Amino acid sequence: MKTLVLLSALILLAYQVQTDPIQNTDEETNTEEQPGEDDQAVSVSFGGQEGSALHEKLSRDLICLCRNRRCNRGELFYGTCAGPFLRCCRRRR
């Protein structure tokens, strides 16, 4: 089960990397969305003992938020949240 979850996350991540542009021009950077009303934090939980071990490992290394439309710069797509939201994560510094 863990393997299936990790494999599907990697496939979704590869798909997002292919669809996002690699570099932003100065014009695109100026019009980039700022965090605000569209961003909503949603708690995500996994059931069972295996799920909580996976959640614990992810939460140590990543900071994740649920975004309305797309992930911000520096964040990667890690699946979906409740409803139409995208789960976007970045590495903890």
Swiss-Prot record:
**Family annotation (SMART domains):** Defensin_propep (SM01418)
Q: Does the keyword DNA damage apply?
A: no
Q: Which domain of life is it from?
A: Eukaryota
**InterPro entries attached to this UniProt entry:** Alpha-defensin (IPR016327), Alpha-defensin_N (IPR002366), Defensin_beta-like (IPR001855)
| Database matches in SUPFAM superfamilies | Defensin-like
**A GO biological process this protein is involved in?**
defense response to bacterium
Q: Where in the cell is it found?
A: Secreted
Region: Disordered, residue numbers: 22-43
The entry's cellular-component GO terms read: extracellular space
Q: Is this entry keyworded Transferase? A: no
Q: Spell out the protein name for this chain.
A: Alpha-defensin 21
